[in-house]
Amino acid sequence: MRRYLPIFVSLLIVSISALILFNIKHSRVNASTTVNDLGEFEKKLTCGRQPLFLTKLRIPQPIAVDLSQQQYRGVAFLFGPNLSQSVHPKSWKRFDHFSSYILDPKGNMYLTPMPYITIEPKTFGFQKSIYKLNSNSGKLSVWMTIDEVTAGTNNPFGLISLDYDCDDNTLWVSAIDKSDYTTSRGIIYHIDVATKKILQKVDGFDALSVKLLKSKKGKYLLVGSARDNRLYAYDIKNSKLSSSPKEIFELTNSVERIRKIDIMGKNLLRLETIPFSYSLIAETGEEQNIRENYNIQWNSSKIKWEILKSK
């Protein structure tokens, strides 16, 4: 009997371990299911409007904003047949390229910077400012500089994405300047537009993209991670961001990063992705043709997000 005792003990240990792993696995599934549900939401009209100077110039609709970095430096407005014409004054080139923009109710445009293939002495300095295109005059200028943002040779990125909060006239802005391949030191800033006061800083997450979403369950800041292929959400309560985000969705391709988030319809999001590794190649020139778009929709009966199509 003693001869078989070690075998019995081994089998007992294996059985207990399997039971523990089973319980851990199922507890994770249940937790993930709860976290993934943002509540029912719809696409809503934005409070932002197009700049008034475009009306003064009698630019016809439709008008598209071009930040592609392929033909124009800075920002350009495209219009006419097949968007073949443009509004792009030389003065709009002075701050190099931009990564994202948002419009406010007056038609002012706020933009975050973007380093390009060729690094110049002025490039790193550009990455710590938010820029404003005046709705009436069309003048492009530095709106606010955050001096603690310090892009450099190891990581040329600084302020990278933003969204406008129609509820309280504020901006949510992300920066990834102090991060590297191993450590996440990103910051999300909440800024009052009227006073330029930083209302809140949340450290420790590299948000490559940000998007506000309001649902029947609450208000969230959706963020696409620069470090992995997942979409996350911060809770917003009393105009304050929660200390840490919760995971919402994971892409099937591990090298893709969510660069842009759009609300397309009922419980429907569109995610634009790029490869990203804290180097310039992911955002420039030839890499434009490997961007992907995914439409994901929350299926309440299956309690999960589903990819509707990819192209």
Model-derived features: positions:
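Beta-propeller blade signature
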Residues: A76-F77, G125-G138, R185-A194, G285-K302
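Surface-exposed loop and turn segments in beta-propeller and other repeat-based domains
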Residues: L78-R94, S137-F157, V202-L208, S244-R257, ...
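Repeated scaffold domains used in trafficking and secretory/extracellular systems
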Residues: K44-T55, F95-I102, N154-L162, G204-K214, ...
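Short, solvent-exposed loop/turn segments at conserved positions within beta-propeller repeat blades
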Residues: Q69-Y72, E120-Q127, S179-R185, A226-R227, ...
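Short loop/turn segments immediately following the C-termini of beta-strands
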Residues: L67-Q70, M114-Y116, I176-K178, T183, ...
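Short coil/turn segments that connect the beta-strands within blades of beta-propeller domains
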Residues: K106-N108, D167-N169, K217-Y220, K266-L268
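Beta-strand-rich domains and repeat architectures in extracellular enzymes and scaffolds
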Residues: L38-A76, W92-G107
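Beta-propeller domains
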Residues: P60-W92, T118-Q127, K132-N134
